[in-house]
Amino acid sequence: MSSANTTVVTTTVRNATPSLALDAGTIERFLAHSHRRRYPTRTDVFRPGDPAGTLYYVISGSVSIIAEEDDDRELVLGYFGSGEFVGEMGLFIESDTREVILRTRTQCELAEISYERLQQLFQTSLSPDAPKILYAIGVQLSKRLLDTTRKASRLAFLDVTDRIVRTLHDLSKEPEAMSHPQGTQLRVSRQELARLVGCSREMAGRVLKKLQADGLLHARGKTVVLYGTR
């Protein structure tokens, strides 16, 4: 895992997506053939160069997909939560090794199954479920592409203040966000917010101070109350 001094820039934030197109029975049958494993917070499940032969399904917790540059900078490609598949590209594009990092953001339980084993099951016991599973993966891939395009446009065309405002609204839709009488309460540090929008921690702090002065939010420590977002 990268050191605390690593520069991180984030291009996309994802909401947890509860089992797209998958009913409880399909999930149960899929999990019956998968290996369940628990991971602590901030654990690298795989890194660039590791063998690419496994599909992951997030049972609980949250993970991030990260691209690592040669100068040790990291580009966070997405946050994914329970009900989402990760590492699905290997089902469609042949690749011997991973090109990104899969890192847990919280304590996680993941279901793991090899591509080869899953393809076999699609021809046998999971044959009735194969269309639904593949459709769910396809929907997730499409949503991730749209989200990445939207976030890339923000980085290209919006200033830091606008990026922070939109990112805070994104975070208000995350499962970790809490209802507040005046809106939505978020727990996010200046450093984390800076990584989410691609600016310095100092700049993030100045923008939060300005937004508070403008009456859009209240920020204290790692707590931000975003007004009017219930």
Curated annotation (Swiss-Prot):
Domain notes: Binding of c-di-GMP appears to trigger the active Clp conformation into an open form or inactive state, hence abolishing its DNA-binding ability.
This protein's UniProt keywords: Activator, Allosteric enzyme, c-di-GMP, Cytoplasm, DNA-binding, Repressor, Transcription, Transcription regulation, Virulence
Keyword Membrane: no
Source organism superkingdom: Bacteria
Organism: Xanthomonas oryzae pv. oryzae (strain KACC10331 / KXO85)
Protein name per the record: CRP-like protein Clp
Gene: clp
GO annotation, biological process: regulation of DNA-templated transcription
DNA-binding region location: 190-209
SUPFAM superfamilies assigned: cAMP-binding domain-like, Winged helix' DNA-binding domain
